[in-house]
């Protein structure tokens, strides 16, 4: 139903979720020649760039980020900022059932967002395959970033900035 309303241009449809990037590369396996040893340096702890993104089917993406864990307060602040951006049609934000999306501070804002034609729609439990922004996060982690991008924190941040900017998705506040 929501896709039909979007297709008929009655609404703007956004898929939203968070992801985290740190200095541990996402290497599911590694090949090596016989009798040679591959070394992958493990890092413990360290910094993490947490992002909350809202991606439309029209190709628009807004990303909010911070280096401390994402909580309900951050989701609320991000959605409040997003609700102030001009939009000619009602917006529907599709979210999964993560605890931060159901935080009381988020629920307290629902009426305010509804007054500016922004509604939240929660996906069924255990259905990340229905949240299209998950594909973007997967491409970032497994396709666009490679081993050299994880050498330092500044290199990883710079690379993420390039990845999102080159896709037309600069990092926001």
Where on the chain are the PLM-derived regions?
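Short functional hotspots at interaction and active-site rims
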Residues: 1-173
């Amino acid at each position: 139903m929501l896709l039909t309303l979007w297709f008929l241009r009655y609404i703007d449809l956004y898929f939203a979720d968070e992801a985290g990037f740190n200095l541990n590369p996402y290497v599911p396996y590694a090949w090596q020649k016989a009798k040679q040893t591959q070394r992958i340096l493990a890092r413990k702890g360290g910094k993490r760039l947490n992002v909350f993104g809202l991606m439309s089917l029209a190709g628009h993406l807004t990303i909010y980020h911070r280096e401390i864990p994402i909580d309900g307060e951050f989701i609320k602040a991000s959605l409040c900022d997003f609700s102030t951006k001009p939009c000619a049609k009602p917006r529907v934000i599709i979210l999964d059932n993560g605890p931060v999306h159901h935080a009381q501070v988020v629920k307290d804002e629902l009426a305010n967002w509804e007054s500016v034609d922004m509604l939240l729609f929660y996906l069924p439990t255990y259905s990340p395959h229905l949240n299209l922004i998950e594909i973007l996060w997967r491409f970032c982690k497994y396709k666009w970033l490679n081993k050299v991008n994880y050498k330092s924190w500044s290199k990883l941040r710079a690379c993420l900035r390039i990845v999102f900017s080159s896709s037309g998705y600069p990092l926001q506040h």
